Amino acid sequence: MLRRALRLRLGPCLSGRGLGTYRRGSTLDWDGKVSEIKKKIQSIFPGGAWNPLYDTSHLPPERSDVVIVGGGVLGLSVAYWLKRLEKQQGAIRVLVVERDHTYARASTVLSVGGIRQQFSLPQNVQLSLFSAEFLRNINEYLAVVDDPPLDLQFNPSGYLLLASEEGAAIMERNVKMQRQEGAKVCLMSPEQLQKKFPWINTEGVALASYGLENEGWFDPWCLLQGLRRKLQSMGVLFCQGEVTRFISSSSHMETASGEQLTLKRIHEVHVKMDHSQEFQPVECAIVVNAAGAWSGQIAELAGVGNGPPGTMQGTKLPVEPRKRYVYLWHCPQGPGLEAPLVADPSGAYFRREGLGNNYVGSCSPTEEEEPDPGNLEVDYDFFQEKVWPRLAQRVPAFETLKVRSAWAGYYDYNTFDQNGVVGPHPLVVNMYFATGFSGHGLQQAPAVGRAVAEMVLEGHFQTINLSPFLFSRFYFGEKAQEHCIL
């Protein structure tokens, strides 16, 4: 009964939400007027430093149709598609709130920048196929007049996934599905693998899958900056600050089975300004939670998961920060320029970095080995004890590698099924999610942004059906399990 009630409510309510409440008046026009007034004052008082107008350019606007919490690639992609799909230019005011505009701790810029279609769920294959098309035609999507074209430095070297005897049948099923969805992937026997990549030790490998198109790696920072540049040209507003509070109203409904539900609607977002105790309230119609590894905390601020255990109101967003290391090493006798990104059955992976016999890679820790996410310090012992032996076993040339540097970043790790959370919350009716992708959010961001924008503007997914990724699955226990997590 609860499932039916939620579906009935989500349909008409989402498509009927108005976004036009705060559209009148342009902050861009006001900023222009302020600039003109300042120029006149300076001409009257030449050489004077006096400014009678308090500079509020660092503050968010008092009102915005949509507030996006998180300025990484996922949040920026949502903003892009909201503006691209709006019915009338300038119809929707969008504000992106990012607490660190240096992106020093951002998952986007600390990732290895890979893109692949080799997943175990068709939705993930579809998302990555569209994202590959987006990246391939990046200057058609993100071109800005009079600005130079973007160069994502895409390396189309593919992904090579290796399977043991135990995982071979699963790999065969996955590849069959990937091909049905349009991905260009081939299967390779150990003999074929040895012939194409003679530097690989095929011991323990029963089967391999190799991406022939639309796979490789690119520069995440370039994509991030390209999106920001495009959004500024589209009139999207940016604010450096931290969301600390939501002001909501509540209403109540009863399901056919007699269960009481409390519906919330966010009316105001409080943004604490950087290096200050000051906060700015922002009235809004829609909130998008794209806060990555910290999206669980943002959801809690909105009351998500604060109800009795076992109820929809008590169901938390199961996304938390997980620290992952990336190591860079030098190996003159390594695989060389033809090396794809290789993912070993042991969990280790690596790829070439540049043209100077450098490589990057790592492996994910077990649950018992999970490092403290409270800092981004690197554990070099983890490489020595866990990563290097696996690399050297698969690629004997790596016996002589020399580590040159390393860094750590965060996964927005979905502990439920390691898959994304996309779309509205069932009870906080105007909060939408774009989070929880557990390491593959960067590569799927263009498609996820489009999906969230479709849901906000039309009330349903239009191009890719991401219903299995809705928040309600956590309450109903319906896992959309992704098995191909690197």
UniProtKB/Swiss-Prot annotation:
Segment forming the signal sequence: none
SUPFAM superfamilies: FAD/NAD(P)-binding domain (SSF51905)
Assembly description: Associates with components of the mitochondrial respiratory chain complex I.
Keyword field: Electron transport, FAD, Flavoprotein, Membrane, Mitochondrion, Mitochondrion inner membrane, Oxidoreductase, Respiratory chain, Transmembrane, Transmembrane helix, Transport
Entry superkingdom: Eukaryota
EC number: 1.-.-.-
Statement: the UniProt record of this protein carries the keyword Electron transport: yes
PANTHER family: FAD-DEPENDENT OXIDOREDUCTASE DOMAIN-CONTAINING PROTEIN 1 (PTHR13847:SF287), SARCOSINE DEHYDROGENASE-RELATED (PTHR13847)
GO CC field: cytoplasm; mitochondrial inner membrane
Biological function: Required for the assembly of the mitochondrial membrane respiratory chain NADH dehydrogenase (Complex I). Involved in mid-late stages of complex I assembly.
Protein name (Swiss-Prot/TrEMBL): FAD-dependent oxidoreductase domain-containing protein 1
Membrane topology: Single-pass membrane protein
Gene3D superfamilies from the UniProt entry: D-Amino Acid Oxidase, subunit A, domain 2, FAD/NAD(P)-binding domain
Co-factor(s): FAD
Pfam family, one: DAO
MF annotations from Gene Ontology: oxidoreductase activity
Organism: Bos taurus
